[in-house]
From Swiss-Prot:
EC number of this enzyme: 3.1.2.-
Keyword field contains Magnesium: no
Molecular function GO labels: acyl-CoA hydrolase activity
Protein name as catalogued: Putative esterase DR_2321
Amino acid sequence: MPIALAGGGFFRVSAPPARTPYPEAMSYAEVLGMTILDASPDLTRVALTVTEAGLNMHGTAHGGLIFSLADEAFAVISNLDAQAVAAETHMSFFRAAREGERLVAVATPERVGRTLATYRIEVRRGEEGEVLALFLGTVSRREKQS
């Protein structure tokens, strides 16, 4: 289907390539270079190294990259013993991260109930470094189907 461009001219839109089934494709977390370090219902840690592609216009780690790291830790911890989907998230940013720095998202449960659970995720500079950002997230959850 031709689409008109501002200033004249056209370009043709083609159908997107067929999606590869998830197990064979790279996940979003893999594309960003994330690694799961620990995964238990009491503590989950996910890490990545900030690359040039993850920088914002100021030369520091993009907020979306930091949010994505926290969100991955949130997704992992909340789905270990239940089927869970995010109902609400909030993130506060305290410090900037630079290219080459290793960031670790440390997720712990604040409260886990039958249908709702809230988790705290601290994004740290390195394994034990300062907290760069704090993510709080609540999921709607149900028991995993066998």
